[in-house]
Amino acid sequence: MALLAGISMQSPTYAKTAHKHASETNLLMINTYTHATNVGKQAFVTRRSITAYETKNDQPDYQNPVQIPKNTALTVQQKLAGNAGYIITVPGNPNKLFFQDTHDSLYSYKSIRNNAHEIDKLTRSSLKWSKKLTGNQRHAIRYYTGDGYEAINDALRGSEKKASKEIRSDVKNINSGIHQFKLSAPLTVFRGTSMFGLKKSLDDQGVKVGGEYSDMAYSSTTLKRMVALSFSKHVILKINVPRGYHGAYIDPISKNKGEKEYLMNGGTKMIITRLQKGYTTMYATIAQKHSGSKTKVKHMTKQYKYWIVTLDLMK
């Protein structure tokens, strides 16, 4: 039944089937296949200020340096042979520039695979952290994972002063609780959202590489893409979280244990580093037995098409 619950969490269509015949349905197998295609020209985002150079006949003019600030999108117009560098353009400058990557000057949009070993390590770290929480901190975090997330996030997005005394206390306890959790290694998490919600968090900048994302509320994310997809309205945020104090892995104490939730700090500022279109196909095989009849094996297929928006925490 745990696996059936997993399908319920991943697919609304399967959820109805599993719920209707819960006592007679067994999951035999589930497989998912995902691929993604990049949108637009190759682009990078600077994580610190860099020096580029004006060009003459697509060759660098080292007599004319151009300073480019951090958190700027670089659109690649040409990659030079032999990894010699790139011909790029930047917002607000129509001229082509020469840039040579220095390894640590750009955000990396590469994700980190959350394998079973890494999830186990994170779970152990979370359990150790949770034992140090006060009763009020634990209660507030659990309340958030249940019925409290809307009221708490509304308070954070609006005015905490207008929120009830209980909600203000919950916010204080959640903050003090999750700020104690230290992520010991970089992590990639996922969040399902809508295009409307994404644009709102981008403050109407437009969905583009270099767009700056911010939400004063906590962001519930998950280690599992398919869990995020079940909450998505055609948009998945893929967030690369560096080591440090950026939130907490709360799954072991969550009321929705199994969703693999990493709760990000409210007000976390991020920047779009990659845009893709994602395609996922889910194959499920279940066995159903109705009263007085033979067991029937059913094969189900569901396809998803969605945007993948890769975000990195801003420097």
Question: What kind of region is each of these model predictions?
Answer:
Residues S108-K315:
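Mono-ADP-ribosyltransferase
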Residues M1-A15:
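Sec-dependent N-terminal signal peptides of Gram-positive bacterial secreted proteins and lipoproteins
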Residues I7, T37-N38, F44, P60, ...:
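A generic structural signal for short, solvent-exposed coil/turn residues
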Residues M9-S11, Q67, P186, T268:
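Generic detector of short, well-ordered, non-transmembrane alpha-helical segments enriched
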Residues G92-D104:
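A short macromolecule-binding patch
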Residues I50, D101-Y109:
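Structured surface patches comprising rigid loops and adjacent beta-strands/short helices at the edges
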Residues T17-N95:
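Beta-loop motif signature
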